[in-house]
Amino acid sequence: MPVATRQRSARAAGTAFSPLRWIGFLLGCIVAGVVAMQVYFFLQIAAWQYVAPSSTSFMRAERWRLCGFNVWNCSIDRRWVPYDQISRNLKRAVIASEDADFVNHPGYEIDAMLDAWERNKKRGRVVRGGSTITQQLAKNLFLSSEQHYLRKGQELAITWMLEFWLDKQRIFEIYLNSVEWGEGVFGAEAAAQHYFRTNAGKLGVGQAARLAAALPAPKCFDKKEYCANVRVNFRVKAGIIARRMGAATLPD
């Protein structure tokens, strides 16, 4: 083989297996994967204007935790009901408890996020998220329960998508039908049946306030033997929520 040909072949081989080219290729694959994931989220949320989500990422994780491979004899309790069949008392209680400015903000509150950032910086890790109802829904629909800044960034992106495609009433309807309210209990109808043996549309003020008070720690609320010292706080919080319900603005 002529010397010039051998040199060209060596240069071509060196170029083909250059570490920089491999790094560039891997980075390109990562970027393409991230973009594809965002497109999937975007189109999935667009479809939810017309159809209800059959489940959420958090529901599937909880079902696996509770049931494992025993899917035939084990399940979670979740029963979808339309927005107008959910008690206005529960809607007001959840707004009063979780996100008083829900109908006005664009899905997130800058002041709450900055406050959470300062608290997290002092602790050296993500311990508080400053989450609105839309942010909570974004996390439950698609994300894990891990606490780190990359996940928080993805949560904000999904929050924007939810607010882009869905009006506030639809966001709230999906939230009320998807949020965890106890061990394997998801959504307003399942919670109303589980705790009070009634329909979600018939919840009274006190019942609604108690359910709203449970949202930050629903498993503790449900399994009182594990959280007996916390239930007093639930009762106190329920009383506070009941007094604030009259000022809650609903997305009707």
UniProtKB/Swiss-Prot annotation:
It is found in: Cell inner membrane. It holds the Pfam family Transgly. Keywords: Cell inner membrane, Cell membrane, Cell shape, Cell wall biogenesis/degradation, Glycosyltransferase, Membrane, Peptidoglycan synthesis, Transferase, Transmembrane, Transmembrane helix. It is a single-pass membrane protein. GO terms for molecular function: pentosyltransferase activity; peptidoglycan glycosyltransferase activity. The chain crosses the membrane at residues 23-43. GO terms for cellular component: peptidoglycan-based cell wall; plasma membrane. It comes from the Bacteria. Pathway: Cell wall biogenesis; peptidoglycan biosynthesis. Coiled coil: none annotated. The keyword Coiled coil does not apply. Peptidoglycan polymerase that catalyzes glycan chain elongation from lipid-linked precursors. PANTHER family: BIOSYNTHETIC PEPTIDOGLYCAN TRANSGLYCOSYLASE, MONOFUNCTIONAL BIOSYNTHETIC PEPTIDOGLYCAN TRANSGLYCOSYLASE. This is Biosynthetic peptidoglycan transglycosylase. It comes from Cupriavidus pinatubonensis (strain JMP 134 / LMG 1197) (Cupriavidus necator (strain JMP 134)).
